[in-house]
């Protein structure tokens, strides 16, 4: 029987510069999260894509989450390689950390949802298009911007 746990997948933003350079890159990076989750049979609890790197809170078996990480990296690098010249090379090396306790789980969930809006962007987490904040904070009576 597979034991499911929570995992935090992320990349070091300093190493992954040029990960996103256009709106179509944001859209593709966010969509890859769903494709990988479906393909690997894991649940995405929270996610955000910043211009330098992704953050994803996953729930599933270790092997499935490890495959998710590898698939996301390889799909991202293929996407970037097909659309850019070598001057925009990207190093994308994701980490996968098992979440051991409730305090860390809450910290990762909050960080994942709000981090993309903390770097001087004049936007709230519920309005950030490339994260799951709107799914947590929007009123049921509010029409999502997308």
Region roles according to the model:
Residues 1-52, 59-146:
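Short Pro-Cys-Gly-centered "Cys-loop" motif that presents a nucleophilic cysteine in a tight turn
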């Amino acid at each position: 029987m597979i034991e499911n746990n929570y995992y935090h997948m992320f990349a070091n933003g300093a190493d992954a510069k040029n990960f996103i350079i256009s709106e179509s890159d944001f859209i593709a990076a966010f969509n890859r999260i769903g494709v990988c989750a479906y393909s690997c049979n894991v649940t995405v609890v929270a996610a955000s894509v910043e211009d330098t790197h992704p953050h994803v809170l996953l729930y599933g078996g270790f092997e499935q989450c490890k495959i998710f990480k590898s698939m996301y990296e390889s799909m991202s690098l293929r996407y970037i390689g097909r659309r850019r010249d070598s001057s925009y090379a990207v190093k994308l090396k994701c980490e996968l950390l098992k979440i051991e306790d409730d305090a860390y789980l809450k910290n990762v969930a909050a960080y994942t949802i709000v981090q993309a809006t903390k770097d001087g962007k004049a936007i709230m987490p519920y309005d950030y298009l490339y994260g799951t904040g709107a799914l947590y904070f929007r009123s049921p009576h509010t029409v999502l911007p997308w």
